[in-house]
Amino acid sequence: MAKFIKSAHYFDQYPIDKQFEICVIGRSNVGKSSLINALANKKIARTSNTPGRTQLVNFFDFNNFRLVDLPGYGFAKVSKEKQTDLAAIIDQYLGYRQNLCAVFQICDINVLTNDDVEMSRYFENQKYAHFVVLNKLDKVNKSYFNNNKHKIAKFLNISTDRLLCVSAQNNINIITLFALMKKVVIQAKQEKILSKKEEKMSSEEEIK
């Protein structure tokens, strides 16, 4: 059963273990908290109509993995000093968190911005997987995504197989998204096991 664990400002306040983590990040007010609640099938994340409400790193337990909610980029309605602080919080998590196995970038399907493009490009050469989730599908007509997914993928510089559309409000494709997250974690675990085996074999060869 999914549940909230803790909020953290500093790196040394993060949970200390080897549990794999999936991070969700997006511009302020794209519906990250609503999406987390939809995935949990209950309210475990605070929602707000005020952009920039999430200003800490929030950790949620989803049994087989942790879901981590980062502050929204774009930093609407906060001071320059706070913008610098939030950017540092995001950078320290994305740059140094060893538990991180995948990032799901949440975007508003109605409003894609240059901030979204810049963030997507940031993930190009990272060691963890990167997916884009287009939220608020309920706000567009049914054929919009299929008619525009190649254009959207090109704009965000991502392949169409790493693009998913959902509606947190109406629970559209939430089960599909959760299944993808679990699949990514399973793959990360398998890769870690394989890596350990290869390290062991290499060590044994050196001893010989």
Swiss-Prot record:
Residues 18-187 form the EngB-type G domain. Mg(2+) binds at S33, T54. GO terms for molecular function: GTP binding; metal ion binding. It comes from the Bacteria. GTP binds at residues 26-33, 52-56, 69-72, 135-138, 166-168. GO terms for cellular component: cytosol. Its cofactor is Mg(2+). Pfam families: MMR_HSR1 (PF01926). One of its GO terms (biological process) is division septum assembly. Keywords: Cell cycle, Cell division, GTP-binding, Magnesium, Metal-binding, Nucleotide-binding, Septation. PROSITE patterns: G_ENGB. InterPro entries: G_ENGB_dom (IPR030393), GTP-bd (IPR006073), GTP-bd_ribosome_bio_YsxC (IPR019987), P-loop_NTPase (IPR027417), Small_GTP-bd (IPR005225). Necessary for normal cell division and for the maintenance of normal septation. Belongs to the TRAFAC class TrmE-Era-EngA-EngB-Septin-like GTPase superfamily. EngB GTPase family. This is Probable GTP-binding protein EngB.
